[in-house]
Amino acid sequence: DVFPVRGLVAVYVFITGLYGAVVMCGDEERGLFLPLSYGYRIPCRVASMAAPAIMVSISGLLALWAGGVMTSFPREAAAMAGYCCVVIASAWILRLVCRRPQVLCCIIPFLVIGSLVFCPVFVDAGRFFPGLDQVGRLFPPWYYLQMFR
């Protein structure tokens, strides 16, 4: 099965989560979080990074509804909330690895292309080339899309 609307929403949320990490890295470089007490810095960083992904997740739910692919709202909302948490966590890890917003910006196109090619957004490449579905497991959209198989 392929999921064009659902797949595009998944990739869009992933891109926005990565964008949130880029913006948060830039805010860190400018010293935005330095005036905060130490106990508030990490929660504020996470909130700053998560805000775009959460807003896009809500818009993604509306796109699923408008596209006529929403199954049941509670199930969709729970799946999207879990997926949003996975996207934020993976963006946080990539931010720790890359450290600079410029480096993170440079890897976003590769992650997007990988998500579109190896996850069943338009074509399930794993059906035609065994093993490619295993590569899809490297990308968060793959897990979200598997919840609706």
In which residue ranges do the predicted regions lie?
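Transmembrane alpha-helix boundary/anchor motif
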Residues: 8, 12-20, 61, 85, ...
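Hydrophobic alpha-helical transmembrane segments of multi-pass membrane transport proteins
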Residues: 2-67
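Transmembrane helix segments
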Residues: 101-138, 142
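Membrane-spanning helices that line or support transport/gating and their immediate boundary helices
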Residues: 20-32, 89, 93-96, 127, ...
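Hydrophobic alpha-helical transmembrane segments of multi-pass membrane proteins
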Residues: 9, 21, 50, 77-81, ...
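Short, membrane-exposed interhelical loops at transmembrane-helix boundaries
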Residues: 141-149
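Alpha-helical transmembrane segments and their short interhelical loops
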Residues: 39-116
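Transmembrane helix-loop junction
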Residues: 26, 64-68, 95-96, 120, ...
